Curated annotation (Swiss-Prot):
Protein name per Swiss-Prot or TrEMBL: Iroquois-class homeodomain protein IRX-3
Molecular function GO terms recorded: DNA-binding transcription activator activity, RNA polymerase II-specific; DNA-binding transcription repressor activity, RNA polymerase II-specific; RNA polymerase II cis-regulatory region sequence-specific DNA binding
Species lineage: Eukaryota, Metazoa, Chordata, Craniata, Vertebrata
Function statement: Transcription factor involved in SHH-dependent neural patterning. Together with NKX2-2 and NKX6-1 acts to restrict the generation of motor neurons to the appropriate region of the neural tube. Belongs to the class I proteins of neuronal progenitor factors, which are repressed by SHH signals. Involved in the transcriptional repression of MNX1 in non-motor neuron cells. Acts as a regulator of energy metabolism.
Gene ablation phenotype (knockout): Mice are viable and fertile but display a significant reduction of body weight, primarily through the loss of fat mass and increase in basal metabolic rate with browning of white adipose tissue.
Amino acid sequence: MSFPQLGYQYIRPLYPPERPGAAGGGGGGSSAGGRSGPGAGASELAASGSLSNVLSSVYGAPYAAAAAAAAAAQGYGAFLPYATELPIFPQLGAQYELKDSPGVQHPATAAAFPHPHPAFYPYGQYQFGDPSRPKNATRESTSTLKAWLNEHRKNPYPTKGEKIMLAIITKMTLTQVSTWFANARRRLKKENKMTWAPRSRTDEEGNAYGSEREEEDEEEDEEESKRELEMEEEELAGEEEDTGGEGLADDDEDEEIDLENLDSAAAGSELTLAGAAHRNGDFGLGPISDCKTSDSDDSSEGLEDRPLSVLSLAPPPPPVARAPASPPSPPSSLDPCAPAPAPSSALQKPKIWSLAETATSPDNPRRSPPGAGGSPPGAAVAPPTLQLSPAAAAAAAAAHRLVSAPLGKFPAWTNRPFPGPPAGPRPHPLSMLGSAPQHLLGLPGAAGHPAAAAAAYARPAEPESGTDRCSALEVEKKLLKTAFQPVPRRPQNHLDAALVLSALSSS
């Protein structure tokens, strides 16, 4: 009997010389047990001591007596396998012992093999019974693979699970199984025994399974597609060379033309602005047509010149209806205005008469502008609607005397928190100018001439000549000087102005 898993190809009688009759005793016991019964076999085994020797060698000294007694009592000696070869097991030793254990082998085995042989180690590199060892394909393993191939002639492509199953059955590796099936398919293809539809060149494992003709056809298709792509790229490149360059040049020319037009337009506008500034001089007294673009600048810069209280409380001034552009007047008409000295901000940016400036103007300014005696020449230019009757002026003065607060200046504009106007025709809103003190406007003769005061506050809508325009500007200049006097710190001033503005906005 052989034990290939342990490297023993044949068995030689390796018994110790001090027990030459152990094999005979064991054989007799087995034969007697076979003929007379289990009791006789057990008694003979126990008498000869072969079973005790076996058990002592297998289980160790402490368990030898108990094991022998149990075996003799139960009569298991006749049913032990290989009863004639029981003494050989001690020399084999335990299968899972460490390979360096000294007492595993029998002394006779040590005498026969003086040096340790690698085949005796249970954990060698390639044991004969190791299933992970690469095994050559034999007729038995290939017969199993051929049987599977015959059953699957229409689809000789085993899946991953089927390959694993076949590798376990045939004790081969997955690579060997896959290679065998690939070779079998190739052989059948050469023999014209294909009974399956050819697959693509690559399967799940990346192996080439398609036919050679299919591979050639696919290569030709790939080459044709590459050629077509190259031809398309060449055509596109040629079109770009033919038309793209001209189109780009045209675009560049258009862009250059546009840029030139823009530059010329910008230069023209700059020239016109420079010419207008040169014509107007340093005072900005040009015609209205030249000042269209400066209206927004005047409004924005005028806000900077006003005090903080005016900016926070004043509503936006009403739009003034301007007359259509008139032809520029000759420069000789500007001569009366030229020698008049005035700050540049007041001359360049004439402001419209606003309610906020009047409301926040001081009642007793420190000084009045010199040279304001008498009615200005612009009083005659006032429209006829501003001509006020003396009765209306007297009524406004009486209403003003009733209220001691500065809000009494506006009796006809606010009818809710203040006493209303007297019975009769409603006076004009500018009637308060007649009853206002003289120092309010900065004009000594303004109290006696309400029409002149109204004309001073109302900007002329359409000046007839350069002299009238200059006189109106002089009046406005004087008014601006008085309006921007430092306001004395009185707690009622801001409150009064806020009340007036809120009443005006609600009415």
